[in-house]
A protein has these predicted regions:
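Repetitive helical segments and hydrophobic/amphipathic motifs
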Residues: 11-12
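Positively charged n-region of N-terminal signal peptides that target proteins for export
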Residues: 1-6
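N-terminal hydrophobic targeting segments that direct proteins to the cell envelope
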Residues: 26-30
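Short, solvent-exposed recognition patches
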Residues: 33-140
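A short, solvent-exposed beta-edge/loop patch
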Residues: 118-175
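Bacterial signal peptide processing site
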Residues: 22-24
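C-terminal motif of bacterial Sec signal peptides marking the signal peptidase cleavage site
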Residues: 17-20
Length: 175
């Protein structure tokens, strides 16, 4: 008799547990934990970085080789934007950009190399700790040229320490 009672008690307990579980709300499948943030070209937001706004550096006296640069903007974990003077020719601005890149490479531990050979006159390439810059399609490119305003933009792969990128740009234009 005791065995029967114990069995019934066990069955009742199991039924009660099952019933109480069925009242719980189903887990939501739409929630995502720490979604990866895509870096979008021309979209100047922090993209998950620990900063409040994009930082713009302009109106600074540059050395002779960097005088065409009117502004540099960098967003940690996202991108670097170098805007050259509108009253200069494409080739002048390209030379300026390449000099700026070379200067940064020589003066920063965060850059691992520079290569401007065999590229179009509007492109210059460099790497930050071996991570190439990529475009919106994820293709490995290193710069984007915009005919309208001589804007050159460099985009970092996600996960790269953008604070280092920002620091070398700041160093490049202040020394």
């Amino acid at each position: 008799m005791q065995k029967v009672c114990l069995c019934l008690a066990f069955v009742l307990a199991a039924v009660c547990i099952l019933c109480s579980c069925s009242d719980l709300p189903a887990p939501s499948t739409s929630e995502t934990v720490n979604p990866s943030v895509d870096v979008t070209l021309k979209k100047w937001e922090d993209c998950g970085a620990s900063i409040d706004r994009a930082e713009e550096i302009s109106g600074i006296e540059f050395g002779e080789s960097l005088k065409n640069i009117v502004s540099v903007r960098a967003i940690p974990y996202t991108a670097i934007e170098v805007v050259c003077s509108l009253d200069k020719s494409v080739s002048d601005n390209t030379v300026t950009l390449r000099k700026a890149v070379s200067y940064a490479v020589k003066n920063s531990e965060n850059l691992s190399g520079v290569n401007t050979n065999g590229l179009s006159p509007t492109m210059a390439t460099f790497e930050i700790k071996g991570a190439n810059f990529v475009n919106e399609k994820g293709e490995t490119v290193v710069g984007e040229y915009n005919d309208n305003n001589y804007k050159y933009s460099f985009y970092c792969k996600k996960g790269l320490n953008g604070n280092q990128v920002h620091n070398y740009i700041k160093k490049m234009i202040t020394e």
